[in-house]
Regions:
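His/Asp/Glu-enriched short active-site or ligand-binding loop at hydrolase and phosphoryl-transfer sites
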Residues: 316-324, 333-373, 380-390
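Conserved, mostly hydrophobic/aromatic
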Residues: 174, 192, 203, 246, ...
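Metal-dependent phosphodiesterase/phospholipase catalytic core, i.e.
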Residues: 2-141, 216-336
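Catalytic cores of alpha/beta
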Residues: 329, 390-403
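Membrane-interface segments at or immediately adjacent to transmembrane helices
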Residues: 157-214, 221-223, 248
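Short, aromatic-rich amphipathic segments at membrane interfaces
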Residues: 250, 392, 407-435
């Protein structure tokens, strides 16, 4: 029982320690759901760490159980943790299916470690079985080992590539260089350009008087000092503010403890498009159209397309377009690049249907399968995956031949000279062959 609990605790820690991009999202969700401002994930990981430590003590001192504390208390806490483990992951995977895909991607990329342990364990187990069943079955030992060894030869781990190393995926900076400067500000956009990003990704909102500006959240509370400037309007939707009011806000002071961004204003779309033009970047955006009743609800798309047209960056702009809006977009902005968005749920559209509708780019969540990526590329579509922050995930997509990714970790990914632990197939065969010899020698010992 202690071993089972220990394995589950370590799996919990491994999953969340390698999933830094989603930690903040989960924590913000739990804060919103409970109304309590706390670092919930840190509490959960400390709990899992203590359970793992207590399990280690139980396993180490299992012959002297009294020294590990009351057995009934450990059992109660252990069972509670298992219920928490399966309950939390069930909710997570139902709410965000891409996290389940990510778990499989993580396993596949680092599978050589698992394969090695499994090969050695099965070789030892097979040896014991043959030894216990007499000499007539000893011939089964090399045959069984060969089968176990051959499976990964034909199905290698995700860090193994055949032929030449694919071209490094280009990078779109998510809300600018959002880990180095306040998100969706000119500072973050220019920082991303200076780092060498291929393009910028942002969120566009329209003010109460028709000015297009950058803002991701529905309200201004998280990324501005609206609570100090307009104390009674902290929770009001951003689209209810006029540009005069928005221009008085500080969108930089919230960013850590660095005074360098104090006074950074909320930028208008025109200013960001100027950064795109001056640095020869590509541009992709989410347009947040206000609900009915807003004075510019029906004009937001036209205003945005006109702004892009006037700025002369249409040929470098990816417009995320619903099929019903394609004609309107092509009429207003003929040079724009139509992008099809693929989210967490639903069946991805066929390559043929996207090409027929005039799309040139697929902008998908990173859970998209490698087979689907290649199918889109074979149809002439550019494939961009979002949001990719972890070096191993970027490496996986690099080896898969993805065209580009959208990331918060611009500086880290741009600095990578090659994929993490990337291994040519020939080198992999040498390594795997060496491990196979070790397994064979170990199993042959009497």
């Amino acid at each position: 029982m202690a071993l089972v609990i220990f394995i589950h605790a370590m799996l919990f820690l491994a999953f969340w320690l390698t999933n830094l991009p989603y930690q903040e999202t989960l924590n913000n969700f739990l804060i919103g759901a409970t109304g309590l401002r706390a670092n919930f994930l840190l509490i959960f990981m400390v709990f899992a760490g203590l359970v793992a430590l207590w399990s280690t003590v139980h396993l180490t001192l299992r012959r002297n159980i009294r020294r590990t504390g009351p057995a009934w208390l450990y059992l109660v806490i252990g069972v509670f943790f298992l219920i928490f483990f399966y309950g939390s992951f069930t909710v997570l995977f139902l709410k965000n299916p891409v996290q389940l895909y990510r778990l499989g991607q993580l396993f596949q990329y680092f599978r050589l470690i698992v394969d090695t342990g499994l090969l050695l364990f099965l070789a030892w187990s097979l040896h014991r079985w043959v030894k216990a069943n007499g000499t007539l079955k000893k011939a089964l030992l090399p045959a069984g080992l060969l089968i176990l060894w051959l499976i990964p030869v034909f199905w290698p781990p995700g860090n193994v590539y055949r032929g030449t190393l694919p071209e490094k995926p280009r990078l779109f900076a998510h809300r600018g260089a959002s880990t180095l400067a306040p998100e969706n500000t000119l500072a973050s956009m220019q920082t991303a350009a200076d780092l060498g990003a291929y393009g910028l990704e942002t969120d566009i909102t329209v003010s109460a008087d028709g000015v297009l500006f950058l803002m991701h959240d529905d309200t201004l509370a998280r990324t501005t000092n609206v609570a100090q400037v307009f104390p009674k309007r902290e929770d009001d939707p951003a689209v209810t503010f006029t540009w005069d009011a928005l221009s008085r806000l500080d969108a930089g002071s919230w960013f850590g403890e660095r005074a360098a961004f104090s006074g950074e204003p909320i930028p208008i779309l025109e200013a960001v498009l100027q950064v795109v033009k001056e640095n020869d970047l590509y541009f992709i955006y989410d347009l947040r159209i206000p609900s009915a009743g807003h004075p510019y609800a029906g004009q937001a798309l036209d205003l945005c397309l006109e702004e892009i047209k006037v700025s002369s960056v249409a040929d470098h702009t990816w417009v995320l377009a619903e099929p019903g809006a394609i004609t309107q977009i092509q009429s207003a902005l003929p040079g724009a690049i139509l992008a099809a968005g693929i989210g967490y749920t639903g069946i991805p559209p066929s390559p043929a249907s996207l090409v027929a509708d005039g799309y040139r780019v697929v902008n998908s969540v990173y859970g998209l399968s490698i087979r689907r990526i290649h199918a889109y590329q074979d149809a002439g579509l550019w494939v961009n995956l979002w949001v990719v922050d972890e070096p191993w995930q970027y490496s996986r997509l690099w080896l898969a031949g993805a065209d580009s990714v959208t990331s918060n970790n611009s500086q880290g990914l741009l600095a990578m000279p090659r994929p993490v632990l990337a291994m040519p197939y020939g080198i992999y065969l040498l390594v795997w062959g060496f491990l196979g010899v070790i397994a064979a020698l170990g199993s042959a010992k009497e």
